[in-house]
A protein has these predicted regions:
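Extracellular glycan-modifying ectodomains
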Residues: 1-162
Length: 162
């Protein structure tokens, strides 16, 4: 009963120890027509680490090193980082106060890459207004809708980089 008032008084809150429940600015993103976003608390917590340019520079350097080693064996590296649900739907959060903007994909975009890079966030964002349930409403995983979009993108990259 202690936490009961927050369901009526707060728009954005940590619903329990693990899940945030925040207002969206549209009810069109999920097939259940909810204007709420449920996401795992560690999505928000990991944003600080994922937004650190030094971490991204280091990651990219390691991936470029791996790419060079794989090239010696005639293997091409495809890197496809996945946005978490918080990152994917951040732009649709109605009140962003207290919610750090995820910039991992912006930082990755600026890197010089020797590997094949698929910006899965950009690929999925291009479909978010025309296809509902990119991520499941009540889960942290992307749905079969997103899986099909990403599979087609991977297939295209493989065909273009033979």
């Amino acid at each position: 009963l202690y936490n009961f008032p927050k369901f009526f008084l707060q728009k954005n809150y940590l619903a329990n120890k693990n899940v945030y429940n925040v207002e969206l600015n549209t009810p069109l993103l999920f097939s259940n027509k909810s204007s709420k976003l449920l996401f795992y608390h560690k999505d928000l917590k990991s944003t600080e680490k994922n937004n650190n340019p030094r971490n991204i520079d280091s990651l990219n350097a390691v991936l470029n090193t791996i790419t060079l080693k794989l090239r010696q064996r005639n293997i091409k590296l495809i890197v496809l980082p996945s946005p978490d649900k918080y990152d994917m739907y951040y732009d649709y959060i109605a009140e962003k106060k207290g919610f750090t903007k995820p910039i991992f994909f912006d930082l990755m975009k600026a890197q010089k890459k020797d590997y094949i890079y698929i910006d899965s966030k950009a690929v999925l964002k291009a479909n978010i207004k025309s296809k509902q349930d990119i991520y499941y409403y009540d889960d942290t995983h992307w749905s079969p809708v997103a899986s099909k979009i990403i599979a087609n993108k991977i297939k295209g990259e493989i065909e273009n980089n033979k």
